[in-house]
């Protein structure tokens, strides 16, 4: 009876669904803004129906701002999902079950269904439109419950987000070994590896409540949440698991197609990223487990070290499922060609078998895992991994696991035994590492001809400039052709078929495939000055003053400079470009914003600590005059004049700016995101767009700020919080603006103690939290 009632109820939602899609349009002068999170017109469900929509949060939110911002930052206990076409949804699940009794092919039934995703807290309600579909490769993703089926889901939100995720998976817990998946993703994150955030959540699906595993999808938002700039995300382009074996061709494909098509630089780099993976996979050891083995000899040493540590940790925790090639995922950093592993679908029973004596390479009765050979190169990584394990903050980890739903019994075990257990397991692994193993490397032909079937199923593709060489896997029959742009995208995405055969991109040519990859190829020039390694894409012409520790660099046009993983102490950097003519400026517009270095700044400071640093940049032709990424410390003074685009851009950083003077920026004078920033004195003049732009969940404190002759003095966006003591502006159209620009964030909070807007306009979306004392 309950389900029948919900069929009627959801019919009402289906009737109103499409009218809602167009009711939220908001007309503003801010073209980049989007609707407020959970627009009020979406909240159709009155409190009289609250019996069906229990509270999603145990926290008591006192304001609309805190509730909506909490959606982006706080783990929900319950998510309500309604499907307008509930009958068709359940019919689709029945078809999946019936199909499994014949030939299991779940992709036939992964259709998208419209849905409403609802979060509630006391009197506050948030309704978001989205789509859901079945997800999973095996029948364990469908569960029969009484007279109906439930399944694992993939949810895509048309607008809004949950915990900064617009796309996420909801797994039936048994498909990911329940609490084990929460623990595994959390411990990998704690040790500095990439892993999707995972936690238990109650799902009320059309009135039926069950516990699921919420897991963020590995996409652009995942990279952003891990303080990484977007680049290619790779996974194996293997046949479905029920068809894949050790004879299959299983090279990679790029899954984030949106990044590929943003510009030609990204598109061209896509081919290089797949070549990097080909170097890993093709030359695997013939004597090793062919379903798991990779070859690290042709990639950079830092990536190889990280990959070996990742493999060791998975072996210690018995995540053998995630080590099979078809389940592995990678991020390729286009700035240095490094390849970074991503934990996914471990399959471990660690928490269920924690009291059983551990033996390496044993997992239930699976003999395949006993075929793994770890060579002597793994020995040097064990002490490094042990050091990381010894530095685990167990109290912090325990609190995180509690929030994500782990039982107290397992949390107690982790706090009392985890470090000792992991160190003991690594000791046992060390004993089985082979000191005298001699690798027998696959050749290209060995890999592609593992099975005669590959000749009938596949083509392999090489790209030399604009021409593509299409070959049979035995490299005997080849022809040269041009591929359209759309076909090239399909090739990179693993969807291209030629004569009904799957086409795998390999590399530029065989010589390129056999050569070793190295980091910082674009920044081939290097100088060490005052103990600081400075890299550049051109010869570094500089002068120094030892008394003032001044480094004065005179670059040629489009010269870029990189300082990475450094300690900058009591140093001044002066970067002065020749002023571009108007013609040169117009001709080099795209080159300045997008180039093959993938660094946006003229001066790029990455992963570094700064103390008493001063910076001066003049006539910057780059997207950013200075770009700080994942850096910390304080800057005594920074002065920038004549930037073609942005002057200061800071991402994922924690920086104190003492004295900041920006003059004549072609776009924003200051742009900060995803970090914590403090400005003592901030003077911004003649900023073409914004004086300061603050976004992506940043926290900013400004003691004294003045803005003149700009379009917008202060823009605060996307879950950011800003506290300003004194703010003065002149000749500026908008004093401040508070709005959402990206769907994965929520409203922002602005507090100004003293401001003189001088009759300038203001703009704020209704759910912004604004406290301003205007003295004008």
PLM regions and their residue ranges:
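C-terminal catalytic region of ATP-dependent kinase domains
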Residues: 318-319, 331-457, 464, 492
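Conserved ATP-binding subdomain of kinase catalytic cores across diverse folds
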Residues: 119-254, 319
């Amino acid at each position: 009876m309950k389900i029948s009632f919900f069929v009627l109820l959801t019919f009402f939602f289906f009737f109103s669904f499409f009218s809602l899609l167009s009711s939220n349009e908001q007309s503003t002068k801010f073209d980049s803004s989007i609707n407020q999170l959970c627009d009020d017109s979406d909240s159709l469900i009155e409190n009289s129906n609250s019996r069906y929509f229990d509270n999603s949060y145990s926290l008591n939110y006192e304001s609309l701002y805190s509730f909506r911002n909490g959606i982006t930052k706080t783990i929900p206990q319950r998510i309500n999902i309604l499907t307008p076409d509930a009958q068709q949804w359940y019919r689709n699940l029945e078809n999946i079950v019936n199909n499994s009794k014949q030939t299991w092919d779940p992709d036939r039934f992964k259709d998208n269904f419209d849905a409403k995703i609802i979060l509630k807290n006391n009197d506050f309600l948030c309704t978001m439109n989205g789509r859901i579909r079945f997800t999973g490769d095996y029948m364990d993703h469908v569960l029969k419950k009484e007279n109906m089926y439930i399944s694992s889901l993939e949810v895509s939100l048309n607008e809004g987000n949950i915990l900064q995720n617009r796309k996420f998976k909801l797994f039936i817990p048994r498909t990911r070994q329940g609490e084990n998946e929460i623990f595994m993703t959390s411990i990998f994150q704690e040790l500095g590896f990439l892993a999707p955030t995972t936690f238990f959540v109650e799902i009320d699906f059309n009135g039926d409540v069950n516990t699921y595993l919420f897991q963020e999808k590995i996409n652009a938002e995942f990279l952003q949440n891990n303080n990484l700039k977007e680049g290619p995300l790779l996974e194996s382009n293997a046949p479905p698991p029920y068809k894949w074996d050790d004879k299959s061709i299983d090279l990679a494909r790029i899954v984030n197609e949106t990044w590929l098509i943003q510009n030609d630089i990204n598109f061209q780099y896509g081919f290089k990223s797949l070549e990097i993976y080909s170097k890993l996979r093709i030359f695997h050891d013939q004597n090793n487990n062919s379903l798991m083995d990779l070859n690290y000899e042709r990639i950079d040493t830092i990536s190889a070290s990280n990959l070996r540590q990742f493999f060791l940790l998975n072996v210690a925790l018995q995540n053998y499922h995630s080590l099979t090639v078809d389940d592995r995922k990678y991020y390729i950093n286009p700035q240095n060609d490094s390849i970074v592993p991503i934990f996914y679908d471990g399959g471990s029973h660690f928490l269920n078998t924690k009291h059983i004596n551990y033996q390496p390479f044993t997992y239930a009765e699976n003999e395949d895992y006993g075929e793994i050979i770890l060579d002597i190169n793994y020995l040097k990584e064990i002490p490094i991994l042990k050091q990381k394990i010894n530095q685990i903050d167990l109290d912090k980890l325990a609190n995180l696991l509690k929030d994500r739903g782990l039982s107290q019994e397992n949390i107690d075990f982790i706090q009392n035994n985890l470090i000792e257990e992991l160190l003991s397991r690594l000791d046992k692994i060390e004993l089985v590492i082979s000191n005298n193993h001699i690798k027998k490397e696959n050749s290209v032909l060995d890999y592609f001809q593992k099975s005669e079937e590959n000749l009938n199923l596949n083509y392999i593709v090489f790209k030399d400039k604009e021409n593509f060489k299409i070959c049979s896997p035995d490299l005997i029959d080849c022809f040269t052709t041009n591929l359209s742009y759309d076909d090239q995208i399909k090739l990179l995405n693993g969807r291209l078929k030629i004569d009904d055969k799957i086409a795998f991109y390999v590399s530029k040519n065989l010589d390129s495939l056999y050569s070793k990859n190295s980091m910082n190829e674009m920044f081939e020039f290097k100088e060490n000055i005052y103990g600081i390694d400075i890299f550049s894409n051109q010869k570094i012409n500089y002068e120094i003053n030892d008394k003032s520790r001044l480094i004065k660099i005179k670059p040629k046009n489009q010269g870029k400079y990189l300082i990475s993983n450094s300690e900058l102490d009591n140093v001044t950097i002066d970067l002065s470009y020749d002023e571009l003519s108007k013609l040169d400026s117009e001709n080099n517009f795209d080159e300045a914003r997008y180039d093959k270095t993938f660094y946006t700044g003229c001066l790029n400071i990455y992963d570094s600590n700064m103390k008493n640093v001063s910076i001066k940049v003049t006539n910057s032709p780059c997207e950013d005059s200075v770009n700080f990424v994942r850096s910390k410390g304080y800057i005594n003074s920074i002065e920038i004049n004549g930037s073609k685009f942005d002057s200061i851009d800071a991402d994922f950083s924690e920086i104190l700016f003492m004295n900041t003077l920006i003059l004549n920026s072609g776009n924003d004078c200051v742009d900060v995101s995803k970090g914590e920033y403090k400005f003592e004195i901030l003077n911004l003049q003649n900023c073409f767009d914004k004086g300061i732009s603050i976004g992506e969940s940043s926290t900013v404190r400004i003691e004294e700020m003045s803005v003149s002759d700009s379009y917008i003095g202060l823009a605060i966006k996307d879950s950011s919080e800003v506290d300003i003591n004194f703010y003065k502006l002149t000749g500026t159209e908008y004093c401040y603006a508070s709005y959402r620009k990206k769907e994965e964030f929520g409203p922002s909070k602005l507090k100004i103690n003293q401001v003189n807007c001088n009759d300038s306009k203001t703009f704020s979306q209704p759910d912004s939290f604004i406290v301003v004392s205007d003295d004008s």
